[in-house]
């Protein structure tokens, strides 16, 4: 809640006196939340986000823009995004009624423009993202996804949601053959390289089998 202060000054002849400082608060009528349907992620997962915008005032807001950083973070000298917007997955509701899809730029960042929120009503934007190769999977890793709502004469609203990496083994296997080429009736040697890209060891009880 924003606060403001105000002070008066009284001059009478050569005398000057200041009043007390009056403090007021501005009640923002527009609020928003961001929620992930699933609070954890794994390799090649899909994560669905729900943005809820509530207008508690008597005036509608039009022309709002939602900008989502898709979890962007600094890597080396650049910036990478661990989530990729899945085209065509935007659903936009006003007071629970599905609307025509707004204008979407996949980014990154993801930009959704042309959002309206009626007086004493709400708007909901739902969309899906795919976990990509820049997502961290080590134990304790997470993706912090931040969105910003601007336009329509409002004070910008920033909202975020954090999802955690699943503690699970993620196995990849590569097969190679030697020698290449091989003479007729020669002997071949096959080599399997198994890598665990996950955040937990693959124990014997996991039951990994090569066929």
Model-derived regions: residue spans:
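Exported/extracytosolic protein signature
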Residues: 1-211
């Amino acid at each position: 809640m924003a606060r403001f202060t105000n002070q008066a000054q009284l001059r009478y002849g050569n005398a000057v006196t200041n009043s007390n400082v009056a403090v007021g608060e501005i009640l923002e009528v527009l609020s928003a939340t961001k929620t992930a349907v699933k609070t954890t992620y794994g390799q090649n997962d899909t994560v669905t986000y729900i943005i809820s915008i509530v207008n508690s005032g008597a005036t509608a807001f039009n022309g709002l823009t939602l900008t989502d950083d898709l979890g962007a973070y600094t890597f080396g000298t650049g910036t990478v995004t661990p989530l990729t917007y899945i085209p065509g997955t935007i659903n936009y509701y006003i007071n629970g009624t599905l609307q025509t899809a707004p204008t979407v730029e996949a980014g990154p960042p993801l930009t959704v423009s042309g959002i309206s929120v009626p007086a004493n009503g709400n708007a909901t934007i739902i969309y899906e993202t795919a976990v990509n190769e820049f997502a961290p999977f080590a134990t304790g890793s997470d993706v912090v996804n931040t969105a910003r709502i601007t336009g329509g004469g409002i004070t910008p609203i920033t909202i975020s949601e954090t999802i955690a990496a699943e503690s699970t083994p993620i196995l990849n296997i590569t097969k190679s053959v030697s020698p290449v080429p091989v003479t007729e009736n020669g002997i071949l040697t096959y080599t399997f390289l198994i890598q665990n890209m996950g955040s937990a060891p693959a124990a014997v009880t996991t039951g990994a089998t090569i066929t």
